[in-house]
Amino acid sequence: SGEVIEFSVRENNYLGKGLGVDTAISLSSESIEGKFNVTNPNYNNTDKSISFGLQALETDKLTNFGYKSKKIGGSVGTKFEYLEDFSLGISTSLFVENIETDSTASERQKKQKGNYFDNFLNLELDYDKRDQKFQTSEGFRSFYGTNIPLISDSNTFTNLFTFTRYNKFLDKNVFKSSFYFKSSNSITGENIKLSERITIPSKRLRGFEYGKVGPK
């Protein structure tokens, strides 16, 4: 099953200090993930946001793919409006990970069994021309993000680009179109880790069964 159950608690003015706190737990048939993030949207009245996050993720794909992964880490970063409607985000993240395999795993997968440490520099470019963030009716949003390996065994370089356009038609109707592209490659020619392989988010697929090829 591809069903995901999520519990989350969000607070936009924690302790009356304007801090944003976001805690979430996600459960699926193959994974459990916990996230905790704290954001100061206007650090020292500089119009720059400062954020800190922790993440723990366990992915169990022993049944279908012969491996299991446990990953824990955190990040710290800042985001600010560099030009009108154009925001720049810079952060760094650290993760430790353990990958286990069983007898059903391929020889290539078995070679990836072990412990890993990764440190990334993360960049985000966000150009937002929507008329409003919620219940958008017109405009577009273009987003590009990249994770650059600083210390890593596989040296995986990840790119993400999304583009979404909103057009109003027939009075109260809104047509939404979007483009999604993501890639992961090792800049040193290594095999990327099993946990870093790209999958299309289930919310972007319709009529497909999770973990399989083709429509239901």
Question: What does each of the following model-derived ranges do?
Answer:
Residues 1-143, 156, 167, 173-175, ...:
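Gram-negative/organellar outer-membrane beta-barrel architecture
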Residues 57, 145-151, 182-184:
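Short glycine-rich beta-strand segments
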Residues 152-158:
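Acidic, glycine-rich flexible loop/linker segments
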Residues 185-190:
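Short, solvent-exposed, mixed-charge loop/turn linkers that connect secondary-structure elements
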